[in-house]
Regions:
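Short Pro-Cys-Gly-centered "Cys-loop" motif that presents a nucleophilic cysteine in a tight turn
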Residues: 1-53, 57-58, 66-311
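Conserved G/P- and acidic residue-centered "switch" motifs that form tight phosphate/ATP-binding loops
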Residues: 62
Length: 311
């Protein structure tokens, strides 16, 4: 039976579920969960999507993701592929790790969004020792919602959902806690099961339109780095590597380009090289002070991106 086409929207909010094949746990150790979240953060820096809630269990994980104009399939396929490669290398195994495609369901109402977050945060209730205290589970965003811990992943935007409870942080946390602790019932679980529904969340949120001309990216990178544009086409040079890495990162983010598209722009490089350059670009904006504000500066210089929530 052919697979149904995934329902997607450039301004969609999604319930994403990942799951491993039956015989293999998705996360064998706690370090695996940490690694997955770190790798998701790397992809977040590339694509600028938002994560509103998450919970990682031993064989599956749940997320609420706002694509913010990016292609959710590109994000999840790339992320899961990278995690599977790393997992197989560490545990000396071959073959598939994830069960089929990731599952996604578009969120259609504010009520559904709120109840979905509570459902996700209640997942640890099935684990011995957490039956009455899901907030103590380390690999869930509930602890951040309730103010018990800071978000150490850098992934989370809990404020988007919490604002529906109160503008006052303390009141919002108290009201959200009450919701989580009263909504662990079978009716809610049935409501939130994945079905073949074509639903869509629409709001006043503005999203990034990712259709920039790649030449505009190259000019911006050259201006900000002070490195001549000719270096985009030179091989085996330190400056060339820097500008190519930053350009690859921004083209993936703001042009919605894949590795093949970027190869055509930069010329005479392999897709695997582009993938490595993108990783270098993420490292540069994460660790080098002179590049840390590069993406925000690009946004501030282009009025159609300004105030669209890219962080």
């Amino acid at each position: 039976m052919p697979r149904t086409k995934r329902q997607k929207s450039e301004d969609g909010i999604y319930h994403i579920m990942i799951k491993s094949i039956t015989e293999v746990p998705l996360f064998k150790k706690h370090e695996d969960k940490i690694r997955y979240l770190k790798q998701m953060r790397e992809y977040q820096k590339i694509y600028g999507f938002k994560v509103y809630a998450y919970c990682l269990m031993s064989n599956h994980g749940h997320f609420i993701i706002d694509s913010n104009g990016a292609d959710i399939s590109k994000i999840m396929h790339g992320l899961n592929f990278k995690y599977a490669i790393t997992f197989n290398r560490i545990y000396k195994r071959n073959g598939h790790l994830f069960q089929d495609r990731f599952k996604s369901k578009m969120v259609d109402t504010q009520r559904y969004l709120i109840m979905l977050s509570a459902y996700i945060h209640n997942n640890p209730l099935d684990i011995r020792g957490y039956e009455k205290c899901p907030e103590k589970y380390k690999y869930s965003s509930l602890k951040v919602y309730l103010g018990l811990e800071r978000d150490n992943t850098g992934l989370l935007d809990e404020g988007f959902i919490m604002q529906f409870f109160s503008n006052n942080v303390k009141e919002a946390r108290e009201r959200y806690a009450k919701l989580v602790y009263i909504c662990d019932d079978e009716k809610m679980k049935r409501e939130l099961e994945f079905k073949d529904e074509k639903t869509e969340y629409r709001s006043e949120r503005k999203v990034i339109i990712r259709n920039f001309d790649p030449q505009e990216i190259l000019k911006f990178i050259s201006k900000e780095t002070g490195i001549n544009e000719i270096m985009f086409y030179i091989r085996n040079n330190k400056n060339s590597k820097i500008v190519k890495a930053l350009a690859s990162l921004l083209m993936r983010s703001f042009c919605n380009y894949n590795c093949k598209d970027i190869c055509k722009v930069l010329g005479n490089i392999a897709q695997s090289t582009v993938s490595r350059l993108c990783s270098i670009g993420v490292e540069l904006i994460s660790t080098e002070d002179k590049y840390k504000n590069l993406i925000n500066k690009f946004i501030s210089e282009h009025s159609n991106l300004k105030a669209m929530g890219y962080t």
